[in-house]
């Protein structure tokens, strides 16, 4: 057997910064590619191996199919042998569709729909009575179980809650030979004159038969049931009385006992409310199909409405002061109409909105109804004055009209700033029609079941009680559901609910969901390529993830993982360590082999870290702060259980806890907006808490997250940190530029003048693909340089502006060493480990971790105040241990300057660096949200209830 059959052989890989490397990877093994950020890991795994696998797959398709997929370029590699079908599971949150949920992405919701369609119990959406579709034999069998000797009356419900005299209905029943009817609860003889108020709603049941039950009446009962069902269009009501029946007195029969009432239907209808329920089909439970979706919100569960707080952000202002943002007072059309409103409804245009009467504000917002306003409006050209007499539509109605009539994206954007998302009032956010939500399994409808966490859902199905028939029907469906739920648990996502919108998932969560889906497919002989699946996972959950990866391998697959996590590296069958540096200094294979073999290689930073030769030292002294404390009281947003949190200012604090325990809710949803609004005079929506103290000790709050630094090809690190402004100014001072009269704007790709007008300075042409992602191709005029020939003719130290943008940040720092303002900003980028990134690299190509560090560099390049609070959300994402050392030096320097750093983090090497740890838990979802432990890492390690404490203890013992 050749090596290609046992191994994946890559020869001459040169993609991006790879240095013509040869790599041999074992198949059917867990292989980890490690190395510094920017060393070429993704270039090897995704841009070379996966890209070639994808290209070969497309090449195998017919010419007809290939025309829809386009041509895929061959990666810059000599050859790849032994390549299996490849599946890439990346960090990207691809589902931006608001209809996509965790349940739909994992297909669990599809099985839920099938389960409810097959064994769900339908109820009337109005009265909640159970509705069963039954045959005549089933109805008779049910009635024969009533104790012998009981008297029953078979009633045909012919009118349900309808106005009218219903004379024709009663007359028809009399002609058909029926003697009695129950009208509005009273039993009446039909031969008497019955007069009903036509303005009131009535319910009429025709008495078809009265039977005393015994073993000998089955035949008569069957005939009467058939007659009743035929007369009432498949509906039947049965009054059951004990042996002590009432007597007939005059026209009304009364019962000595309170009769019980039974309802039957042949057609999934409620006999009591005369409401039909559709046949139970899977589509009835789909919020993506009109058959099941709530008609008000079309199955989204939310609606966009114009928000008064956005239209009038400052209610202390008047109309004349511009209180109503979409209605500027300087526009005469607005002014004359508001003046007419003020005159008619007795308020002044100088009155602050807060002081307007409720009636006046209601008219302004919702319109004057049928009451007309009279006002005059002079035409712009002054030709004549038009006189209007018509009702005022109201601000909300007019904005809806303008928004609906907007023809361009920019016009719609103007009005979208005044919209806010509200829960749909019709379905209360449950997305489905009332008929769909009235179907239950063990008293839970499909939305209530989807609202459970994965962990709670597993428990629900373990304790589900079914009849023998139901169990037989649902057996295979339940197996598919429980298998998929367990896969989600195994990748650390037990805290997620199936109703969670896919667009709100982090990149790591989205990746692990796709991983769980792949495990469910049980494919073999596949090459799986994953990008840091441990991102966002607590150490406890990470152990289960590793077991999942090993299970995927044991199925007969090759699992190739780009990873920095120590646990994953130690269990790998094979490690390929790239380096030795990043960017131009990387791209070589520094070490390859089993973990013990890699540890023997002195040049491998990864190997030395695993061997314990390189460590992040534990601080000798923990800071106690500057004496001031920030306290947030009674936090109860999402799953947080009315906790109060104290953060000592002037310290480095880590927020820890298992996945879903409430870390992001506390820091991002509550603390950051609360501080930003009070310290920075912002207007961010705040999470729920009662009060906050200590904000007066801060003068700035900075949140450094992982969102992109820009969403177009023009956005790049140089523009984001502002260094490109200094570079453009420098180029404008070059003698050639002065001679040509070029200003700094000439060297900008955002404005006309010096940029290539064919691509508008993007360097690429964007091709919109409608329902597919946009495609970018290199501009064939400027060939990606972004500028026209005249601009590129200006040189500084032998380089033009395009050459500079193509430099790595490290190269640029050396190139501009004589220009302090430029060096200071580039130094900040280098200090956070981004020296390998190119100055002009498109923001679209930066990972979340890289984008976060660019933002951090921007803040580092500013003058420190010593009273700033920095908030970080897992800043070690995508970082090698050596990069983490560099990052922690920056963080500790910020705190040494008197600032406060609060960070969500799972990396134990970072957590033990903190002055204080706040550990949330004990579990995720509704089982979390409390403070399990708080104090120094040493103190937290002694608390047995703290999951994080267990792992802190391990790290502290290992390093001491």
UniProtKB/Swiss-Prot annotation:
Keywords: ATP-binding, Cytoplasm, DNA damage, DNA excision, DNA repair, DNA-binding, Excision nuclease, Metal-binding, Nucleotide-binding, Repeat, SOS response, Zinc, Zinc-finger
Organism superkingdom: Bacteria
Keyword rRNA-binding in annotation: no
Keyword tRNA processing: no
Residues binding ATP: 35-42, 657-664
GO BP: any one term: nucleotide-excision repair
Zinc finger motifs (C4-type), residue ranges: 270-297, 756-782
GO cellular component: cytoplasm; excinuclease repair complex
Entries under PROSITE patterns matching the protein: ABC_TRANSPORTER_1, ABC_TRANSPORTER_2
InterPro entries: ABC_transporter-like_ATP-bd, ABC_transporter-like_CS, ATP_grasp_subdomain_1, P-loop_NTPase, UvrA, UvrA_DNA-bd, UvrA_inter
Entry GO MF terms: ATP binding; ATP hydrolysis activity; DNA binding; excinuclease ABC activity; zinc ion binding
Domain ABC transporter residue range list: 327-605, 625-953
Subcellular compartments: Cytoplasm
Major localisation: cytoplasm
NCBIfam families documented for this protein: PRK00349.1, uvra
Family: Belongs to the ABC transporter superfamily. UvrA family.
Function: The UvrABC repair system catalyzes the recognition and processing of DNA lesions. UvrA is an ATPase and a DNA-binding protein. A damage recognition complex composed of 2 UvrA and 2 UvrB subunits scans DNA for abnormalities. When the presence of a lesion has been verified by UvrB, the UvrA molecules dissociate.
HAMAP family according to UniProt: UvrA
Subunit structure: Forms a heterotetramer with UvrB during the search for lesions.
Protein name: UvrABC system protein A
Organism this protein belongs to: Treponema pallidum (strain Nichols)
């Amino acid at each position: 057997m050749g090596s290609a059959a046992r191994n994946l052989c890559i020869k001459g890989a040169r993609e991006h910064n790879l240095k013509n490397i040869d790599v041999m990877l074992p198949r059917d093994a867990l292989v980890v590619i490690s190395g510094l950020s920017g060393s070429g890991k993704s270039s090897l795994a995704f841009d070379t191996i996966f890209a070639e696998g994808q290209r070969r797959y497309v090449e195998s398709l017919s010419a007809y199919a290939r025309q829809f997929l386009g041509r895929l370029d061959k990666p810059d590699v000599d050859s790849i042998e032994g390549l299996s079908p490849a599946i890439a599971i990346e960090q990207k949150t691809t589902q931006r569709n608001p209809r996509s949920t965790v349940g739909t992405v994992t297909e669990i919701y599809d099985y839920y729909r099938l389960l409810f369609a097959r064994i769900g119990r339908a109820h009337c959406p109005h009265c909640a009575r159970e509705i069963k579709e039954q045959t005549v034999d089933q109805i008779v069998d049910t009635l024969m179980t009533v104790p012998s000797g009981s008297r029953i009356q078979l009633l045909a419900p012919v009118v349900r809650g309808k106005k009218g005299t219903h004379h024709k209905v009663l007359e028809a029943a009399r002609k058909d030979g029926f003697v009695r009817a129950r009208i509005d609860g009273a039993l009446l003889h039909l031969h008497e004159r019955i007069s009903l108020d036509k303005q009131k709603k009535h319910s009429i049941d025709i008495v078809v038969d009265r039977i005393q039950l015994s073993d000998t009446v089955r035949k008569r009962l069957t005939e009467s049931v058939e007659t009743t069902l035929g007369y009432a269009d498949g509906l039947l009501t049965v009054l059951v009385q004990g042996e002590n029946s009432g007597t007939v007195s005059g026209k009304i029969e009364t019962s000595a006992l309170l009769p019980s009432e039974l309802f039957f239907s042949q057609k999934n209808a409620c006999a009591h409310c005369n409401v039909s329920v559709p046949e139970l089909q899977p589509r009835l439970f789909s919020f993506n199909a009109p058959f099941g979706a709530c008609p008000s919100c079309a199955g989204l569960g939310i609606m966009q409405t114009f928000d008064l707080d956005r239209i009038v952000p400052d209610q202390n202002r008047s109309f004349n002061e511009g209180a109503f943002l979409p209605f500027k007072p300087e526009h005469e059309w607005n002014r004359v109409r508001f003046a007419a409103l003020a005159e008619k409804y007795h308020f002044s245009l100088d009155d602050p909105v807060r002081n307007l009467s409720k009636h006046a504000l209601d008219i302004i917002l919702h319109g004057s109804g049928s009451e007309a306003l009279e006002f005059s409006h002079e035409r712009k050209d002054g030709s004549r004055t038009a006189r209007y007499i018509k009702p005022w539509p109201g601000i909300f109605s007019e904005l809806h009209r303008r928004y609906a009539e907007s023809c361009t994206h920019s016009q719609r954007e103007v009005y979208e700033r005044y919209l806010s998302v509200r829960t749909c009032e019709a379905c209360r956010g449950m997305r489905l029609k009332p008929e769909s939500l009235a179907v239950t399994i063990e008293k839970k409808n499909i939305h209530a079941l989807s609202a459970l966490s994965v962990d709670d859902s597993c428990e629900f199905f373990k304790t589900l009680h079914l009849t023998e028939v139901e169990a037989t029907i649902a057996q295979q469906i339940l197996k598919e559901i429980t298998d998929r739920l367990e896969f989600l648990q195994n990748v650390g996502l037990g805290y997620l609910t199936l109703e969670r919108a896919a667009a709100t998932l982090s990149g790591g969560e989205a990746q692990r969901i796709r991983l769980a889906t792949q495990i469910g497919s049980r494919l073999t002989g596949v090459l799986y390529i994953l990008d840091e699946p441990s991102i966002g996972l607590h150490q406890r959950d990470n152990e289960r993830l590793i077991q999942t990866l090993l299970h995927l391998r044991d199925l007969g697959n090759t699992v190739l993982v780009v990873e920095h996590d120590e646990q994953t590296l130690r269990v790998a069958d094979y490690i390929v360590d790239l380096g030795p540096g990043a960017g131009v200094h990387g791209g070589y294979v520094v070490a390859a082999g089993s973990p013990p073999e890699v540890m023997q290689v002195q040049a491998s930073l990864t190997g030395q870290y695993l061997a314990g030769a390189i460590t992040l030292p534990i601080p000798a002294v923990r800071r106690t702060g500057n004496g001031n404390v920030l306290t947030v009281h009674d936090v109860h947003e999402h799953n947080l259980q009315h906790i109060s949190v104290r953060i000592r200012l002037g310290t480095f604090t880590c927020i820890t806890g298992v996945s879903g325990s409430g870390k992001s809710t506390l820091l991002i949803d509550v603390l950051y907006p609360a501080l930003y609004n009070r310290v920075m005079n912002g207007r961010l929506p705040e999470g729920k808490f009662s009060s906050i103290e200590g904000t007066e000790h801060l003068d700035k709050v900075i949140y450094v997250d992982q969102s992109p630094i820009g969403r177009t090809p023009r956005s790049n690190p140089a523009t984001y940190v502002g260094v490109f402004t200094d570079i453009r100014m420098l180029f404008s001072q070059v003698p050639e530029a002065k001679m040509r009269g070029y200003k700094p704007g000439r060297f900008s790709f955002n404005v006309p003048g010096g940029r290539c007008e064919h691509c508008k300075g993007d360097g690429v042409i964007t091709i919109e693909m409608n329902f597919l992602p946009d495609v970018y191709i290199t501009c064939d005029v400027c060939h990606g340089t972004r500028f026209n020939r005249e601009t590129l003719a200006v040189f500084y130290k032998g380089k033009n502006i395009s050459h500079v943008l193509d430099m790595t940040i490290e190269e640029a720092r050396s190139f501009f060493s004589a220009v302090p303002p430029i060096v200071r900003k580039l130094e900040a980028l280098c200090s956070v480990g981004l020296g390998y990134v190119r100055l002009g690299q498109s923001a679209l190509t930066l990972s979340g971790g890289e984008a976060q560090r660019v933002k951090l560099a921007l803040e580092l390049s500013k003058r420190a105040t010593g009273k700033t609070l920095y908030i970080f959300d897992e800043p070690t994402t995508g970082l090698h241990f050596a990069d983490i050392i560099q990052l922690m030096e920056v963080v500790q320097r910020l705190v040494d300057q008197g600032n406060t750093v609060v960070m969500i983090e799972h990396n134990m090497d970072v957590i033990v660096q903190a002055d204080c740890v706040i550990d949330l838990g004990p579990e995720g979802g509704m089982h979390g949200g409390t403070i399990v432990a708080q104090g120094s890492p040493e103190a937290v390690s002694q608390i047995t209830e703290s999951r994080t404490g267990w792992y802190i203890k391990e790290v502290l013992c290992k390093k001491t």
